[in-house]
Design a protein with these regions (language model features):
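Bacterial N-terminal signal peptides that target proteins for export
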Residues: 1-6
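Predominantly soluble domains enriched in secretory-pathway, periplasmic, or organellar proteins
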Residues: 12, 16-333
Length: 333
């Protein structure tokens, strides 16, 4: 079911020069912040870091994907709860016009519930985890409907789609001790990658050769080779005893930043065994966005309603600013 709330139609998305940028977004036009605890999406000026406007959404938005041309953002509505405790699950996907900073349309995902993670492929198809129904929804945002569903053996919370659109890797939290591997051409699960203590966040490298899965119970990441779907190595996060949470590659593939507790670890993405640089940020960091020049990372401190700006090369915090109530994730666009 599609409820149109604007007359604008979604045109075919223009593909970027490098398809690997689709789920590693950046830009210079604006900042999009998903204020989960505040029930809003917020638009900031990327130069001044001041808020331009905001939109109230149903409770609660957690994640986003952008169209290839950065005209639209796609935001699933998870519900007012959290993982495994979400008694009023959401069932909508909001389409936001980034230039106009308004809701363009709402796609109803019912009967599927608790949509959480979302990724986009080079054809413009969206892949959305429907946690309570243990499915991946394939959504055509131009048609405004679900075009297919994919069964897999886990609940599914976050997912990572490879840049070439061949496979998706699904993090199953504590529901199953593995990452589900999905063939997106056949829309079938084709394997699993062992994660004995469960999986928190998950991300693919911009070149598609690696997937990073975050250990749910330990300060450790698993490095998955996407050719073999085997774990190449497990890397301990320095300077923390907290479990790993999420990881983000910079769009140029140079850096990998991870979060655990209130710590950020900065890796040289080409050599994850090299010494890490760590620094403390605000409470419960959850999301990271990268500036277009690759120099700055913005860290959403979900636990205290702030965002920390990091000079990546220097591994220092340059400023911390107030933003909403509890930002889960964010991006430049």
């Amino acid at each position: 079911m599609l409820r149109s709330v604007a007359t604008v139609l979604l045109s075919a998305a223009a593909l970027p020069a490098l398809s690997e940028s689709l789920n590693h977004t950046t830009g210079t036009d604006g900042l999009l912040l998903i204020d989960k605890l505040g029930g809003h999406v917020r638009f900031f000026d990327p130069a001044t870091l001041a808020e331009r406007s905001s939109l109230e959404l149903p409770k609660n938005p957690h994640d986003f994907a952008l169209s290839a041309d950065h005209r639209f953002a796609y935001v699933p509505i998870y519900g007012p709860g959290i993982y495994n405790r979400n008694p009023e699950p959401g069932h909508e996907l909001y389409v936001l016009d980034l230039a106009e900073r308004k809701v363009a349309r709402v796609i109803d995902l019912a009967p599927y519930r608790s949509p959480h993670g979302v990724q986009v492929d080079a054809r413009g198809m969206l892949y959305v985890t429907a946690e309570l129904d243990r499915k991946i929804l394939v959504v055509d945002p131009q048609a405004g409907r679900i075009v297919a569903t994919i069964d897999h053996d886990g609940a599914g919370h976050w997912l990572a789609v490879l840049p070439d659109g061949s496979k998706a890797y699904v993090a199953n939290k504590d529901d199953k001790p593995f990452v589900s591997v999905i063939d997106l051409a056949t829309r079938k699960q084709i394997g699993t990658v062992p994660m004995p203590r469960g999986t928190q966040g998950i991300t693919a490298s911009p070149d598609g050769r690696r997937v990073i899965a975050m250990d749910l119970a330990q300060p450790e990441i698993a490095v998955i080779d996407t050719a073999s779907d085997a774990v190449l190595e497990r890397v301990r996060l320095a300077g923390t005893t907290d479990p790993a949470y999420k990881a983000y590659y910079s769009p140029d593939g140079r850096w990998l930043l991870t979060m655990a507790g209130s710590s950020i670890s900065i890796f040289d993405a080409a050599n994850l065994s090299a010494p890490q640089r760590t620094l403390k940020v605000g409470a419960s960091p959850m999301g990271i966005g990268f500036s277009a020049d690759g120099k700055t990372a913005l860290v959403a401190n979900h636990g205290d309603g702030t965002v920390s700006a990091i000079d990546i090369a220097a591994a220092t915090i340059t400023t911390t600013f107030k933003a909403g109530t509890g930002i889960e994730t964010l991006t430049y666009y």
